[in-house]
Amino acid sequence: MEKPTSSTNGEKRKSPCDSNNRNDEMQETPNRDLALEPSLKKMKTSEYSTVLVLCYRKTKKIHSNQLENDQSQENSVNPVQEEEDEGSSQEDEDLDSSAESSKQDEDLQLPEGSFQEDKDLGLSEGSSQEDEDLDSSERSSQEEKDPDASEGSSEEGEED
């Protein structure tokens, strides 16, 4: 099966058999198919996985962000709420102290000048307003406790 070729100048070369050519072609074809298939699979897989991963990550990010946001909101809101609670408790304490001072004022029956003294001590005008508000709320609570007494006092007011 050796044939001299003109290009080899009389040198004998082995030419491949037809069966070998077929085997090579068959091997090349599946390799080509396999080579194309993985690249297609990779592209398809990467496209689909990218879409799935993006969706998954979005969902995951949303959940993780929500959890982180919830935790951060709890952490950030709680200190704010605690500060507000502290602020409101301070206001409550201020109201309690002003209520006590107004009770003391009532007990001592100080003249109206006591409000001026409060202003001189550095208390704001609002604190005297709060004292007046507390006095009216104390009166209303006393009226609720003693409806007969409030009726009597209202009758006295009508007589004047």
From Swiss-Prot:
Bias regions of kind Basic and acidic residues — which residues? 10-35, 136-148
- Region spans: Disordered: 1-48, 64-160
- UniProt biased composition (Polar residues): 64-79
Q: Name one Pfam family in it.
A: SPAN-X
Q: Where in the sequence does UniProt note compositional bias of the Acidic residues kind?
A: 81-97
The family annotation for this protein states:
Belongs to the SPAN-X family.
Name assigned to this protein? Sperm protein associated with the nucleus on the X chromosome N2
